[in-house]
Amino acid sequence: TGQPTLSLEDLDALLEEDEVEESMASLNSSEVADIIGIVAVLGFAFFSFARKSVALKYISFAMSIAYLGLYKSNLVSIVNIFAILQGNLPGFRHSIPWYLLIGFTVVSTVLWGRLYCGRICAFGALTQVLDRLLPSRLRIDPPAWLDRRLAYLKYGILGGVLVYFLGTGDFLIYRYVEPFWMFTLNGNAVMWTLVAILLVATVFVRNLYCRYLCSVGAALGLISNFTVFRIRRWGECQTCKICEKACEWGAIDGPKISVAECVRCDDCERIYHDQKKCVHWIVLQKKPRAQIITSS
């Protein structure tokens, strides 16, 4: 008597804590290294996003390509969506990096939008680096009306793939609708031919796969409609076209930013805060002068 008693809920909580401690203790050095690696990539990607630095963004690209792409071949895939739909998730103990990547992707999308697409995806990072290295004279920019229609293609692909999978249970369809497998260097002649065509086309149309064909991008685009922290717009954005012309993703239409297409690349946000480029700041700087001239 007089001794505190534990409820069933308290006992369950203690057991869960013991299981977590046991799980962490049972991890081998390779698994710990994987956790450190994914945390480093995700952490630096977010740091570069917060700082709005072009140099840091390209370092983040290099980390994603090297680690998530070439070393681990670990990208968010339509296969992950299949697994979630089936409730067929990997065991937590030996799949912590997977849960960290998926968790970060979903949470960051809800908070800021398609940050994964614009900063972390190894294939997206690769195409953005290629776009910077290749001569701009090779580039073909689709007219705005066509660009906005082509952007719907990825949603059709996502819907078609999901219907196919739910009807057949064949997850191998992913090999023909996304090129992420190429980092494993394991594909047949048809798959490599499709990837070759895609990469050649990307030389001429920047971010072609990400903008028009990526089913994962489509899924994250749908989630982005609920994004909490969106890019602000000034009143002058009604008529100014500077950010719209600078956007490489076709996500800006006049004063509106399509959150489903925006990958938070930072380009417009750097202009947005540049007092020498952004019309909003230029107008504010001229107002005091105008008032002085009027009063005199």
What are these regions (language model features)?
Residues 3-254, 260-296:
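Non-ligating segments of multi-cofactor redox enzymes
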